[in-house]
Amino acid sequence: MTKKGRIMGSDVEPGALYRNEYLIEYSDVDFTKELKLSTLFMHFQDTAGQAAERLGGGVDILTQRYSVAWVLLKIRVEIDRSPLINEAVTIETWPHPQGRLEFNRDYRVRDAKGNIIIRGTSVWALIDTKTRELRRSSLIDLNYPPFIEEHALDYKFVKLKP
């Protein structure tokens, strides 16, 4: 499967883990030949979107059924090593149990040898597409498989207040 020449393939694990393989290209790096944060976040978003689609929470379903959309509220990333041009990487993502307003999702980036080179965690919420107000997470029904208890980062964001 190819998307803009970047996605090399997807791997759906039994359970909540979802993977995408990417090849880092010239447009993905900065003048130091290291991955741009904007590209990393784009790949995180694409991989999370595909994983959400698999769980019944894709963009089309949310918009048509519930008149809501995903919005990224917070993200934290720790980079041990930045991938270089022509390097193949695998992005893994998995959700955690939802809160009242928020959905937490973790990420790992592995190099071709399987070493974890980047870790991330994020907080997402639902926003009403008409009123632009936050909506409770219980509004939608996601088909969650068993959760992975492992966290990519030992970091807790401050909870949202309704």
Predicted regions and their residues:
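A broad, structure-centric signal for solvent-exposed, well-ordered loop/edge residues
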Residues: 31, 36, 42, 79, ...
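Hydrophobic beta-sheet segments that form the core/acyl-binding groove
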Residues: 75-113
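Hot-dog-fold acyl-thioester-processing enzymes
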Residues: 2-72, 121, 128-162
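Hydrophobic residues positioned within well-ordered beta-strands of beta-sheet architectures
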Residues: 18-20, 75, 91, 105, ...
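Hydrophobic, ordered structural segments
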Residues: 108-110, 116, 123-131
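Short coil/turn motifs at beta-sheet boundaries
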Residues: 15, 68-70, 86, 100, ...
